[in-house]
A protein has these predicted regions:
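Conserved non-catalytic scaffold segment of RNase H-like nuclease domains
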Residues: 2-101, 105
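Short, glycine/acidic-enriched loop or turn micro-motifs at the edges of active sites
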Residues: 4-6, 131, 169
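Active-site-proximal helix-loop-helix substrate-binding element of RNase H-like nuclease domains
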Residues: 44, 51, 57-60, 64-67, ...
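Substrate-recognition/cap helix-loop segment adjacent to the acidic, metal-dependent catalytic center
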Residues: 99-124
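Active-site catalytic microenvironments for nucleophilic, acid-base chemistry
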Residues: 107-111, 151, 176-180
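A contiguous pocket-lining binding segment that forms or flanks enzyme active sites
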Residues: 123-132
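Acidic, divalent-metal-coordinating active-site segment for phosphoryl/phosphodiester hydrolysis
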Residues: 162-175
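Acidic two-metal-ion nuclease catalytic site recognized across multiple nuclease folds
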Residues: 172-215
Length: 215
């Protein structure tokens, strides 16, 4: 999972490539039994706006002081990449929505990051679990991570919009969906809530439209 800060509009070249810059990368690794075996977390120092804007600080809890001595995007991404490939020769990158993959690609362009063949292969293997789950449940709109956790009757672990916490909650939903040993009652609650019983709920309550709003 990623957390981000805005790029100033007056920096036209940088803003055209990406309106945002990554300020935190968080991930967890699951074994074949869907148990967490490792985690990754780093802050990232933004290049084009070193001041964390108040709305993003409030949302993420990340302050300017917290990223002041953090690695830049290139180093932080390499650390994350190496962490992934050092875990196992066979791995899958699972994200909640395609936004994280797209942000990394946009930021690579923005910062003129040169991808090695190994990194290209790594970037081509990401899976959008939000989309996969939506197709499994026959959803026509985007379900937010927080709403998925809520509808499953699970407790959101930690603070929202914390990269590691969001990654852990995504992993929890992934385990509920794919681990045959897990009770499927939580998944059934989502199906029941989103099909015949959605009439009394507004779309804003059930679905996440934030990814369609451009900063």
């Amino acid at each position: 999972d990623l957390e981000m800060n805005g790029v100033p509009k007056d920096n036209k070249e940088a803003f055209e490539s990406s309106h945002m810059e990554i300020i935190e990368i968080g991930a967890v690794a699951l074994d074949e039994d869907y148990r967490e075996i490792d985690s990754f977390l780093t802050y990232v120092k933004p290049r084009f706006n070193e001041i964390i804007e108040p709305r993003y600080e409030e949302m993420t809890g990340i302050s300017t002081a917290m990223v002041k001595d953090a690695p830049g995007f290139e180093v932080a991404f390499e650390q994350f990449f190496r962490w992934c490939i050092d875990l196992d020769k066979e791995y899958e990158i699972i994200t909640w929505s395609s936004n994280d993959e797209l942000q990394i690609r946009h930021e690579m362009k923005q910062k003129k990051y040169q991808m090695s063949n190994e990194v290209k292969q790594f970037m081509n293997g990401w899976k959008d679990f939000q989309k996969i789950m939506g197709e499994m449940l026959g959803l026509e709109r985007v379900l937010s991570l927080e709403k998925a956790i809520e509808l499953m009757g699970l407790d959101f672990q930690g603070r929202q919009h914390d990269a590691l916490n969001d990654a852990r909650n995504t992993a929890e939903i992934y385990a509920v969906v794919f681990d045959d040993k897990r009770d499927k009652e939580a998944l059934n609650r989502v199906k029941e809530a989103l099909h015949p019983k959605t009439e009394g709920a507004s779309l804003g309550e059930l679905f996440d439209f934030s990814q369609f709003v451009q900063s």
